[in-house]
Amino acid sequence: MKLNRLLAIMGLVCLLHSNPIYAQDQFTVSGYLRDSSNGEALIGATIRITGESIGTVTNVYGFYSITLSKGNYVLDYRYVGYDAFTQSVELNSNTRLDIELKPSEQQLEAVVISGKAADDNISNIEMSTAELDIKSIQKMPAFAGEVDVIKSIQLLPGVTTVGEGAAGFNVRGGSVGQNLVLLDEAPVYQSSHLMGFFSVFNPDAVKDVKLYKGGVPAQYGGRVSSILDIRMKEGNSKSYDVSGGIGTVFSRLAIEGPIKKDKASFIVAARRSYADVIAKVFTDALSDGTAMYFYDLTAKTNYHINENNRIYLSGYWGRDVLEFDENQGFDWGNRTASFRWNHLYSDKLFSNLTMFYSNYDYGFKFGDKDDLFQIGSEVSTVNMKPEFNWFLNTNNELTFGGEAIMYLFEPGTMINKSVGETTNSSLESRRALEAAIYASNNQKVTEQLSLQYGLRLSYFNYLGGTVFEYGDTIPGNTKPIVDEYQYKKWGSIADFYNLEPRLSFNYKMSTTASLKGSFTRMNQYIHLISNTTASTPIDVWQPSTNNIDPQAADQVALGYFKNLSSNEFELSAEAYYKWMHDQVDYIDGADVFVNQYLESQLLSGKGRAYGLELYGKKNQGRLTGWMSYTLGWTELKVDGINYGGDKVNRIGDWYPTRYDQRHNVKLAAFYELNDKVSFSANFSYISGTPTTFPTDRLNVAGYVVPYINNNERNNYRIPDYHRLDLGMSINNVWRGKKGRSGEDNIAISVYNAYGRQNPFSIYFSQERGRIPVGSPVETNATQLSIIGSVIPAIAYNFKF
Amino acid sequence: MLASCEFEIQPKLDTPEELMVVDAFLTDQLGRQEVKITRSQPYFESSKPELITGLSVTLEDLTADVSYALIEGSDSYYLDVSEPIGFVGHEYRLVVETPDETFEAIAKMNRVPGIDSVGYEFNEANFLVDQDHFTAQFYSIDPEGTGDCYWIKAWKNGNYFGKPEELNMAYDASVSPGQPIDGQLFVFPVRAGFINPYTSDDPEISESQPPYVVGDSLYVEIHSIDRAANDFLYALYFQINRMGGFGEIFSSPLSNVSTNIMSTDPGSKTNVAGFFNMSAVSASGRRLTSTVAEQAKTKYYE
């Protein structure tokens, strides 16, 4: 707490110290930066004052504001991949300058990897972030030829996955449930289609993807590991575009265009799978003819009311359906809707109000017309989030705002029909309120030093209903229930407050090198309950309660950033250490499915993750791409797990998590042969993930049961994972020729090019088949590969 | 194209503990009641474990204050029961004395509902089986009052449903303690989910099979178990039930199942494994005769 107070006071002092100088005549030049071809806002574009070391970058809505003394200036607007634009201004009053930049013609020389200024990585305060624009995502060779946002970020340092088919991703030793995935600011609770093979984001509707692994600004919170901020396109406000593609898994179609030119536009993008291709994954479990499909629909519209007001409405609807017949099946999906209102209170004060709804649910059904057993789970949130950017002066940009989230959890719905008679045995719904207020300042202290310091006060209130109280027991056993009583509906059963200080610095050592550091504290009030080898769609979200404390993580990171040959090469090295508290784990045999006493089977422990990330990127030329290496450790210490011979107290010893991957090498390369043909390649090498090997087998209750000497957890590792993917794109195959408008390409990709059978897991089981009672039983170890072969794919994409 | 693949491996494992395992699931039935006491084996050892001999094994009815000394046989310690020794509501203790140490476990025999009937249903060809076929269910009502736990065992044509994935348990009328369904017919998954084998016992046959054809029989037993045994079997289910293939994504981490066998010396460092439970048993069975089959068809077409 002392540290919190100290930081708060420091922040205040810095702010007061840097109060704008009102004595002089100061005027503001502000406006929006957009793409001249389609009107899309340009996020993170730079505006520099020529001849002075003053500048700013556009925010996520493309807005910028610079306050200067009276005088004549030349403003230089830049965004990589676009022609630079200069504008002279005689500043004697506040000036609005909305600028449109033209996409560069010289595609070959363009930086393909990200937008931004060429030296953004040096000058920007941010560290531990990774950005990918949709153009680079589209260039990567993809699994089954389907461009995928989540799979692409897994090529960045510090980001991993436990294997093919696993949903979600792991960031710097965090679990899948510790990532906040935002689509136009609305959280997406389950980011995968078909378990984890594809992510739910339609690339045709995505504009920008940014991942915060550390150094998280104060406006973000609610998860302890990372924030993945995905922004959707606004829709072309100049002309109508139809784009789409036919791939091996999805067929896609997106339509965008102006509703009223330069005033209002829309985009609607849809995808649907071809089920039968993928159904073969399930050859073991399912019979032929299984109905299985998934789809998503993404839509957005915006209306430019006037110079100072713009509203956006966006929505997502996606679903996976796996139905055997009308009474048997499994389905899941997300729904989100966001409303946003950008308002300029003045040239210096930009505001955005977001309101959203987000829902995730899944359901199973099993039976026939007379006997049916249906179970499911659901989480819904309604959120309001006002945010203000106050461009105080050239040295300070203040961000402040708040957030209020109402949660409704349906931990388990259960409808049971027996011999025609239906009973509803659903678990009671749970409600909770999460709120936060925050303030953060980006301050340029000197030419060399900039700071970002902020404070977030977060609050969580678990609201009325049935209260369960549990007694103590030996760690690892189900806790006994000692009391169960009703609490008034909107009463507070448990509440939590936390101060989350955030601090980052950037010390610019030269124009090509900088040293950055950050401290981030994050709290997480809702927990993804997942006790399986990999995260799956049936994982449920659970609030913090009187029995589950909020999770917390403190992270420090230090990085050195260096650019070479006029920003052609970017190099960086970052080291991080993360302390995690109140991490959720599970007793053996925990029933996490539909269980009103779930909390009696949860364990709480601490975690630590640390590592080093090295990154090198080539930005220009025909050959571009990056290489990264991550050395990482991530461990948990939970009483009741990995407790060795300590039968009485079961004090747990540190053990590596399932996603502890020591070495992680990633390579992405893009080569533009000519205007027509380009190549791409990805390579991944990841240390084998930890797993538990038994030592003994027990004969009990008629079964052969594995036993682990010394109660160890994750005492072995499966073999290393490595994979090469190759891609080739041929542009303008049909369109763009003989006077046909538009563009198209054929994308050919080969996933797992050398056909390695990468292990997903090694499991131990007794022999299959029916063994007569009393006969000896064989026990085996089996290595499983989810994908065991080369997967070629071809897709045709078009736009006109 | 995307088929997952699996192959058997022979990894080197850490040193086995070879600890004592007490397998003592006893019932209220007459006849031979057996306690198997063996040593755990190295994981890849597939022989039948041998009985640890020379132990003293005693079953005590704590409620009635009676005790029974078990006789050492060739592969178990046993009692040949001719007069009932198990009574619902009684508490029992199993005592195992080794030369160095004494171990004991306590269990309570709980009530068990009767089985009203075993029935067959007629189904037209569906996504599971590409021909008309019969499936079976048993009908039994969980008595009112929460906390009843059951282990349901079944035999088709005298062959025990003993595959890991066929371990069938009920907590009250549903599957687990967290699912509050009490005092009614067992839910459909319990009644039908584990006794309809669609896979052939012949590994050469991969197509789904009709679970029952005319001439087959089904015999079902409900064993009452206590809460500790329920938790033990529930955890055991996750340890032994490895579906393989894509289902591995849903598997939980490997860990040791619990035990209720404790040393009488609280400071003992000796590890033992296994479980002691006393079950009351109810049973019923029926053969799918052509008459039963015709009745099921008639009912279906009604």
Q: Which residues does each predicted region cover?
A:
Chain A
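Periplasmic N-terminal accessory/gating domains of Gram-negative outer-membrane beta-barrel systems
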Residues: 112-117, 121-179, 183-216, 233-234
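Surface-exposed extracellular loop regions of Gram-negative outer-membrane beta-barrel proteins
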Residues: 361, 408-419, 461-482, 511-555, ...
